[in-house]
Structures are given as C-alpha cells and as structure tokens.
C-alpha cells in the first residue's frame, strides 16, 4: 500500500528560503509530515540538485529516508513516455532529473510528491497520473496547504481554511 511523500527539489528549496513564494505553505506541509509521522522520502537526485547551492540541514536529513537511484528506478524512468510531457522548445536534458524523481516516487510506492514547480514537474506528474503511469498524488505548493490531500474523504480542516482566508 502506498505511503509517504517524496520531496521534489523545488519543495526543499522553498522550505529552506524564507523569501520564496509559498515558503509558509512548504513549512506547514513539512510540519504536517513530521507531526503525523508521514514517511518522508528524499531522492539522491534531489540531494544532488539542492546541494549545488547549499548543504541539506541535518535536522531535515534526520527526518528523511534517502532513496538512492537504483536499477528499478532507472528502468521505470526509461519506461515513462517523457516525449508526451515535454513542453514545446524544452530539450530532453532539462527533463531527465524530473523524470528520474517521478520514477523513484513510483518505485518507492510513495502516496504523494510535493513540489513548488507547478510549470513543469507538477504538470508532468498530472499527465503521467491521468495516463495511469503513476499512482501517487502530486501536491503543488501554489495551491496552499490543504490537509484534505491526506484525508481519505478529502475533508479539509476548518481551522486551515480560516487561517488561509478561503
């Protein structure tokens, strides 16, 4: 049974940078994951991308299960039809890491992937999900924090709705 959440690089960057749009939403999701003992997966690909600018804080790392990119992940990435999700004018090289992270989430049987990248990563996930190529639910930070993403009945929390002025 699927469980846990895989963090996309853009989520981690947004969580780390108080000046980025959606930082507060990222912080609330992180707090929700930790307080509710939701398994948090961290891809070595995300580690590689994030570590270009800064080290991952030890308190973040301690909460995560690190996923190395392995044989099964590679085969799943190769099987995903990346040509269908490629935006006009974007070369394959720009998509490779996103496809690998998506494949890792599928192989890890994550229930969710959380991202701040709604323009490409989120869109790729939605396209693959609608084609039944993945089963996890993508969560985008731009939509705001919503506990309903984790509720089997899709029930939002009234306090959360009041806090975000919905």
Go through each PLM region and give its residues.
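A generic "structured core" feature
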Residues: 1-3, 24-26, 33-42, 73, ...
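Short, flexible loop segments at the rims of nucleotide/cofactor-binding pockets, characterized by
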Residues: 17-20, 45, 88-93
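Acidic, PIN/NYN-like endoribonuclease modules and their adjacent C-terminal/linker elements
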Residues: 2, 111-166
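Active-site neighborhoods of divalent-metal-dependent phosphate/nucleic-acid chemistry enzymes
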Residues: 68-123, 158-165
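Active-site regions of enzymes building and remodeling cell-envelope glycoconjugates
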Residues: 59-68, 133
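Short, well-structured N-terminal submotif of metal-dependent ribonuclease cores
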Residues: 1-41, 52-61, 148-166
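Short, surface-exposed acidic-centric catalytic microdomains
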Residues: 46-60, 70-74
